């Protein structure tokens, strides 16, 4: 059953009524199909209306929804011949960032992304998608491997940010993030990044300095979380909604600001309500972007990527 967000209470109430009527439908003396159909139409219309006018803070809640597809779901739904690659060849294998070789609609690619996990044990295993230095160094290693063999790189970004623990800082978290960003910019092969949920701070940009940056319709991408921004500006996280609006972190705002290149539409009610449709939509968008980049000379890819990021913030 779908976990409803706080702004979906009316939809939740209608769905409960539908469920109750369905239970009564087992009684052969009752004819309630018409009532169920009317309630389903009302629920669908209400859901469309709500999602057509989501605030940035509400989009943040959708992007964080626990049932939203994660990296492993995209790998299972879009890629064949998946061969995971592990370790940074220096310290450890960070499970917050996964990556490996795969075949995507006929072409060999390198796929790298954040994995948050689905339940408590897996979220602990993947550290809620918050990577440590060894995770970013693993990503660097895989990008270098892709560059060596001429494989396009696809990255799927979904993290609240890099892990801020003392051990991560002692092992060079800032340096690892910077090196990963640098490696993205130095790739001589096509690179397409997609923000599929949260895109938080340097932990996100380290995998997103790509030729083309895509975002799901209800994903968010920012330098800090709304709660963190509110705590700095207003000394309270209670103003997270105001912070989210001020930071322009939605896909629509970022497309207008030319931070991203394309918005991938989500099913009505968010990717968590129809994961297969969302995964297919992302696959189509990735294929189109790779088709546009394939065959371009190395120098052209490098120059275009560099200019893209240097142009950000210019008048």
Curated annotation (Swiss-Prot):
Q: Which UniProt keywords apply?
A: ATP-binding, Cytoplasm, Fatty acid biosynthesis, Fatty acid metabolism, Lipid biosynthesis, Lipid metabolism, Nucleotide-binding, Transferase
Q: Which Pfam families does UniProt cross-reference here?
A: ACCA (PF03255)
UniProt keyword Transcription regulation, yes or no:
no
What reaction gets catalysed by this protein?
Answer: N(6)-carboxybiotinyl-L-lysyl-[protein] + acetyl-CoA = N(6)-biotinyl-L-lysyl-[protein] + malonyl-CoA
Name the Enzyme Commission number(s) assigned to this protein.
2.1.3.15
Q: Which InterPro entries match?
A: Acetyl_CoA_COase_a_su, ClpP/crotonase-like_dom_sf, COA_CT_C
Its function, per the record, reads: Component of the acetyl coenzyme A carboxylase (ACC) complex. First, biotin carboxylase catalyzes the carboxylation of biotin on its carrier protein (BCCP) and then the CO(2) group is transferred by the carboxyltransferase to acetyl-CoA to form malonyl-CoA.
Task: Identify this protein by name.
Answer: Acetyl-coenzyme A carboxylase carboxyl transferase subunit alpha
What is the organism of origin for this protein?
A: Sphingopyxis alaskensis (strain DSM 13593 / LMG 18877 / RB2256)
Q: Which gene name does the record give?
A: accA
